[in-house]
Swiss-Prot record:
The keyword Transferase does not apply. Keywords: Cytoplasm, RNA-binding. It comes from Xenopus laevis (African clawed frog). Residues 1-68 form the Sm domain. Belongs to the EDC3 family. Residues 280-484 form the YjeF N-terminal domain. The DFDF domain is unstructured by itself. It assumes a helical fold upon interaction with other proteins. It is found in: Cytoplasm, P-body. Residues 84-181, 219-243 are annotated as: Disordered. Residues 187-223 form the DFDF domain. This is Enhancer of mRNA-decapping protein 3.
């Protein structure tokens, strides 16, 4: 009757040490109380040996998963009569009572092809391995896998091939044997066919219409009353605001906030787009006279213009990159060309402030028997600095300086252009190859001998010519009512600065 169980698929539980084995019954030895399984699986992993043999003492539980078709003619009563056959194998004794546990498993619904019968068997066993999937699940995966699928073998599952005749594997006594066994574990498995074609991610992604899916989701949410979520085009998204933006609607921007009674012939605009019209020299002079009458004296105006001009000059010299304690060995040098008038006094005030910032100042001022009081006062203050004063062009440096500040020209003293010292100073500035900054240059009708790169205007700009270079405007502190008194509707274009650039319109 033992031969009737050949070809059956069984599951043998050998306890926690040896694990669970599944396979097809290939031999049953009633005398030696052994059973052999062909094509065995250990804890769901296929063994590398073709056949394993178990003793009855090692078996804790035996389940019959499938009976071959020729054995289905036996009824359950017949199976009970043949209890001495393979269906009821004795298990290990428990608690020393000598009683043995007998278990019969129900037939599985899986249709697994039968194995060959009548194979010779030798007693052997494999080493324990970690528990995994059942034999039936593992077999179904193997059937459903494509031909080019490459199985990844577990290195622990291949340990049984090294000890075919032992239940518990023994370590090799030599070190070289251990290394060789490890190499066999890692590289000994035969490589199966590797798929040649790679997965087409781009082509697969092109088949997915995200916009249509999002639209379907939004439509479903609208019908369900759950509200809408913006996933589509940016036009459908609700407006977002930064932390410094106002969510309230503001009034329209007015760019022309300065209105003059008579245009000077040219208009400028700031970086923010505000329009700054130019005024005539007569209106500019009237504005300064009214401001002086209200308390903005010449000394205050000289101080404000000197501070603004020095700030602009420090920026042109390089700012903090040039003026820092690490660059004491390369202090910038500035040449001041000043005339004997109020505009020259503005340049002297600028030189005094620059000298306080460790800038080497060379002041050129021609000798006059009598000078204006503002010029004398500013010159006395300048002499208290480390700046150098010269009265001859020959004493000016021959090598290029970092910056030249021009305050030679004046509308009231046009005759100074014919003086020899003036012509010599103009020739020196044009040949020094240093950039030139004009402070409060005269109106465009006055011919300027020095070609400037920048020009700084006070209060409101004049209509300057092309030789003035880029135009800048500084605030000298004229009150708004003073502008209104001379007929100018004024709104400050400076923002948070004292000096701003102007662009021609």
């Amino acid at each position: 009757m033992a031969a009737d169980w050949l070809g059956s698929i069984v599951s043998i539980n050998c306890g926690n040490t040896l694990g669970v084995y599944q396979g097809c019954v290939s031999a049953v030895d009633r005398i030696n109380q052994t059973i052999s399984l062909s094509q065995p699986f250990h804890n769901g992993v296929k063994c590398l040996v073709p056949e394993v043999t178990f003793r009855a003492g090692d078996i804790s539980e035996l389940k019959i998963l499938e009976i071959p078709s020729e054995s289905l003619k036996y009824t359950s009563d017949q199976l009970n009569d043949h209890s001495t056959g393979f269906g009821y194998l004795p298990t290990r004794q428990q608690n020393g009572t000598g009683k043995q546990k007998q278990t019969v498993a129900h037939n599985s619904a899986q249709n697994i092809p039968g194995q060959e019968e009548g194979k010779a068997s030798e007693p052997s066993s494999t080493s324990p391995q970690p528990c995994s999937k059942s034999f039936v699940d593992r077999h179904n995966e193997a059937v459903n896998q494509p031909k080019n699928f490459r199985r990844r073998h577990n290195s622990l599952g291949s340990s049984s091939s090294r000890y075919p005749n032992q239940v518990t594997p023994k370590k090799s006594g030599t070190k070289n044997g251990q290394l060789k066994a490890r190499d066999d574990e890692c590289f000994g498995d035969e490589l199966e066919e590797i798929p040649d074609t790679d997965f087409d991610f781009e082509g697969n992604l092109a088949l997915f219409d995200k916009a249509a899916v999002f639209e379907e989701i939004d439509t479903h949410e609208r019908r369900g009353g759950g509200g809408t979520r913006s996933r589509g085009t940016p036009n459908e998204r609700p407006p977002t605001y930064r932390h410094d933006e106002n969510i309230l609607e503001s009034e329209p921007i007015v760019y022309r906030k300065i209105v003059v009674p008579q245009s000077g012939g040219q208009e400028y605009c700031t970086d923010s787009g505000l329009v700054v019209p130019s005024i005539s020299y007569v209106l500019h002079k009237k504005l300064l006279c009214v401001a002086e009458k209200h308390g903005l004296s010449v000394e205050r105006r000289l101080e404000m213009s000197g501070v603004c001009a020095s700030q602009m000059a420090l920026t042109l010299l390089g700012g903090p990159n040039r003026l820092n304690p690490k660059n004491v060995h390369q202090r910038p040098t500035v040449a001041l060309l000043c005339g004997p008038h109020v505009k020259g006094a503005q340049g002297i005030s600028c030189g005094r402030h620059l000298a306080n910032y460790d800038v080497d100042i060379i002041l050129f001022l021609p000798n006059f028997v009598k000078m204006l009081e503002p010029v004398t006062n500013e010159l006395n203050l300048f002499c208290q600095t480390q700046g150098k004063q010269v009265s001859s062009v020959k004493d000016l440096p021959e090598c290029p300086v970092d910056l030249v500040i021009n305050c030679l020209d004046c509308n009231e003293n046009a005759f100074l252009c014919d003086q020899p010292w003036y012509r010599a100073a103009v020739d020196w500035a044009n040949h020094n190859r240093a950039p030139v900054l004009n402070i409060d240059p005269p109106v465009g009708d006055h011919v300027q001998g020095i070609h400037a790169k920048w020009s700084l205007e006070l209060g409101l700009p004049l209509a300057l010519g092309e030789q003035a270079g880029r135009i800048y405007l500084c605030d000298i502190g004229i009150p708004q009512k003073v502008f209104r008194e001379v007929g100018i509707s004024y709104h400050s274009p400076f923002g948070c600065k004292f000096v701003i650039p102007l662009h021609s319109m």
